[in-house]
Amino acid sequence: MARKSLIQREKKRQKLEQKYHLIRQSLKNEISKVPSLSEKWEIHGKLQSPPRNSAPTRLHRRCFLTGRPRANYRDFGLSGHILREMVHACLLPGATRSSW
């Protein structure tokens, strides 16, 4: 189980990313439309003004049961070992065990 503070920090980052998403997107569109390099640098400076944690690259997927940050399966939102336990217990419909 991940520490609760790390899970809360990740939730805070998600809220910030949603809050500043449109601002970042509009600034990036402006950069692509402006022909002169000096104006691009000015817009790039504005792009750096939102908080760092509002950048989408700082988000990290976590298992929604345990909060584990590694080995997550996007389709299920679970980490690998929790996914395996749930499949063995037949708690995930449509998921089958395989061996090769």
From Swiss-Prot:
Supply the PROSITE patterns for this chain.
RIBOSOMAL_S14 (PS00527)
Keyword rRNA-binding attached: yes
What keywords is this UniProt entry annotated with?
Chloroplast, Plastid, Ribonucleoprotein, Ribosomal protein, RNA-binding, rRNA-binding
Q: Superkingdom of this entry's organism?
A: Eukaryota
Q: Which GO terms describe its biological process?
A: translation
Care to name a GO molecular-function term for this sequence?
A: rRNA binding
Major site of localization recorded for this protein = plastid
Annotated localization: Plastid, Chloroplast
Q: Where is the signal peptide?
A: none
The record's listing under SUPFAM superfamilies reads: Glucocorticoid receptor-like (DNA-binding domain) (SSF57716)
User: Which family is this protein grouped under?
Assistant: Belongs to the universal ribosomal protein uS14 family.
Its biological purpose is as follows: Binds 16S rRNA, required for the assembly of 30S particles.
Q: How does it assemble?
A: Part of the 30S ribosomal subunit.
Q: What is this protein called?
A: Small ribosomal subunit protein uS14c
Organism whose genome encodes this protein:
Cucumis sativus (Cucumber)
**Taxonomic lineage per UniProt?**
Eukaryota, Viridiplantae, Streptophyta, Embryophyta, Tracheophyta
